[in-house]
A protein has these predicted regions:
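Conserved Rossmann-fold NAD(P)-dependent oxidoreductase catalytic core, especially the SDR/UDP-sugar
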Residues: 1-46, 70
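Structured loop/turn residues at beta-strand edges in well-structured enzyme cores
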Residues: 6-9, 67, 136-139
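NAD(P)-dependent short-chain dehydrogenase/reductase
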Residues: 23-31, 46, 56-134, 147-149, ...
Length: 230
């Protein structure tokens, strides 16, 4: 309402891939995250519902008050300068930190069977995508993410390979998690991958940097943070 009163020219809302229905993400090899698949709505978390309701709120203000809205559904943005410890970090930072802090010949935990799939977009690519979206005249929700899907175990192995260490992955799930941490394993959906066809069609741009290159940059930054903490 304040934006209407102040006559704000353009508004960006950062939504999330978590808005997509759980039933479209049960196949780790072929998840459906096309923008039009958001309805019938059934996000797998309260966070996803909050993001979806907010999208509808912004679109209502667009229809009723003429606000100029841009909505991006982010898919796992990562990179240096982000949270990397304490339990609130995302998977890329967690994998890098574990590979850095685990001794050569040791092992680190990966919750679940590691077969879940995800995609991750480096922060520089995300910023460029947002800039191009804001400069466009496209006003519908659109994915901003990478289409380079990877299993969680392979993602952990990527961090290990970057470290140059001999580290084994210990998949922890089921009763083993409950016995050790006293809560169920939080796995999320089985598969999630950005579908960038709409962005390419309407905005005319696509991501270029590989996941491995982004992980190498993130790894080096987190390594410096760990050295400072020693």
């Amino acid at each position: 309402q304040e934006s209407v009163m102040k006559k704000v020219k353009k508004i960006f809302y950062s939504s999330s891939a978590c808005i997509y229905p759980e039933y479209n993400q049960e196949d780790p090899d072929n998840p459906n995250c096309e923008e039009s698949s958001a309805y019938p709505a059934n996000p797998d978390s309260d966070y996803g519902w909050e993001k979806l309701f907010s999208e509808r709120l912004y679109k209502a203000f667009e229809r009723n008050y003429g606000l100029n809205i841009r909505i991006a559904r982010f898919h796992n943005i990562f990179g240096p300068e982000g949270t990397w410890a304490g339990g609130r970090e995302k998977a890329p930072a967690a994998m890098c930190r574990k590979a850095i802090t685990t001794e050569d010949g040791g092992s680190f935990e990966v919750w679940g069977d590691g077969k879940q799939t995800r995609s991750f977009l480096y922060i520089d690519e995300c910023i460029e995508a947002v800039r191009r979206l804001m400069d466009s005249d496209f006003t519908e929700p659109v994915n901003i993410g990478s289409e380079e899907m990877i299993s969680i175990n392979n993602f952990a192995q990527m961090a290990i390979d970057i470290s140059g260490k001999d580290i084994t992955i210990h998949n922890l799930y089921g009763q083993e998690v409950e016995d050790k941490y006293e809560h169920p394993t939080p796995l999320g959906v089985k598969g999630r991958n950005s579908d960038n066809r709409l962005f390419r069609e309407k905005i005319g741009w696509e991501t270029k940097q590989s996941l491995e290159d982004g992980m190498k940059k993130t790894y080096q930054w987190i390594k410096k943070q760990c050295e400072v903490m020693e």
